[in-house]
Structure formats: C-alpha cells, structure tokens
Amino acid sequence: MPEASTSAPRQATVTRKTSETDISATLSLDGTGTSSIQTGVGFLDHMLTSFSRHSRIDLAVICKGDLEVDDHHSVEDVAIVIGSAILQALGSRAGIRRFGSALVPMDESLARAAVDLGGRSFAVVKAEFGRPVIQGMSTEMVGHFFTSIASGLKANIHIAVLDGHNTHHMIEAMFKAFALAMKDAVCIEGGGIPSTKGVL
C-alpha cells in the first residue's frame, strides 16, 4: 500500500516501493500547473507535463522502474501513486464540484473525458491506435494508465477518442481532456459533501 502524508491543505506526497518500482509523487491541487516529471518513459513524461499544465495541478514525479523488462510496471504504478496522491490531497472532499467533463480537439483528433470523484473506482477507455509504441510507451498502456489512476483515486473515469488517426495527437487529446475534467472536478464550490448520502 502507498504511504501518504499531507503537508498542507489540498497537497500530498505519496511514495510506493516494490520489487518493480520506486516512486514518489508530490502535488498541489491549487497550483499553477508547474511540473517536474521523471518516470523514465519519455512519452509518459510528456503526457503528465501536459496533464499538470492543463489541470493546474502542480506535480512532481520521480520513478525508478524495471524498464529493462518493459514499461508496464512503471506506467501502472505511476498512475496508482498519482491517483492516491490526489485522493489524499482531496481530504474529505467537502465542497468540491466532484464532477468534470471536457471535449478536446488536437488537429484531426478529438477526445472526450468525464470524471466523478465520488469514491467509486471504475474506468472505461475507448481508443484504437495505429502505433504499438510511442517514445518508449506501449500504446496498450494508455488505457491501463487511466484504469490504474481511477483505482488509486477511487474515481469513475470515462475517456474516448471520437476521431483521429495520429497516435500522438489522439493520446495527447485524451490526457488534456482528462486534465480539464479533473480541473473542474477538484475545484471548490462550497456546500459540504457533494452527495445525498452525506459521505463520499
């Protein structure tokens, strides 16, 4: 299990060390979108930098993984740790908007994302890519990234590529749509716990 500590409201640091990966992630939900990403997987670094910028979540990630095997463990565990850190930073989730959605074009590509931070882990990812690998990241791991972050975050995430043929553009549109959906979902609106049950 990840070990977590909150250093200030809406901030968290989470670490996870296994025989496969050694990861630390620090973030602030009320940031400006600054980031420092070192996962060892070039394309994942690029996508997480974009996620940070467009969600306005300050994010620092360091991962040492068994890339001599492949990228699976690093991508999966980085997603789990980031999701866990966001969950810790949210605290009781009192006053958050909870839901967020976005539609993002990138040239010929179009992606849609919807998020519910209601405590139910589930992910649906619909995308087909023409390239098996891009900058060290297996494209089959894109869907697994979102499934894993949903698990760590205890969130319901739906992401779909609606159009496109350039693999880079399609995946980047997905991450940007997810970022904008998260930006909405984590924002503070007030009004207590956003659930008729009274808890999340």
UniProtKB/Swiss-Prot annotation:
HAMAP family listed in its UniProt record: HisB (MF_00076)
GO terms classed as biological process: L-histidine biosynthetic process
Protein name: Imidazoleglycerol-phosphate dehydratase
GO MF term set: imidazoleglycerol-phosphate dehydratase activity
One GO CC annotation: cytoplasm
TM segment ranges: none
Compartments (UniProt record): Cytoplasm
EC numbers: 4.2.1.19
Principal location: cytoplasm
Catalytic activity: D-erythro-1-(imidazol-4-yl)glycerol 3-phosphate = 3-(imidazol-4-yl)-2-oxopropyl phosphate + H2O
Pathway: Amino-acid biosynthesis; L-histidine biosynthesis; L-histidine from 5-phospho-alpha-D-ribose 1-diphosphate: step 6/9
Record-stated family: Belongs to the imidazoleglycerol-phosphate dehydratase family.
Lineage: Bacteria, Pseudomonadati, Chlorobiota, Chlorobiia, Chlorobiales
Xref: InterPro entries: IGPD_sf, ImidazoleglycerolP_deHydtase, ImidazoleglycerP_deHydtase_CS, Ribosomal_Su5_D2-typ_SF
Coiled coil: none
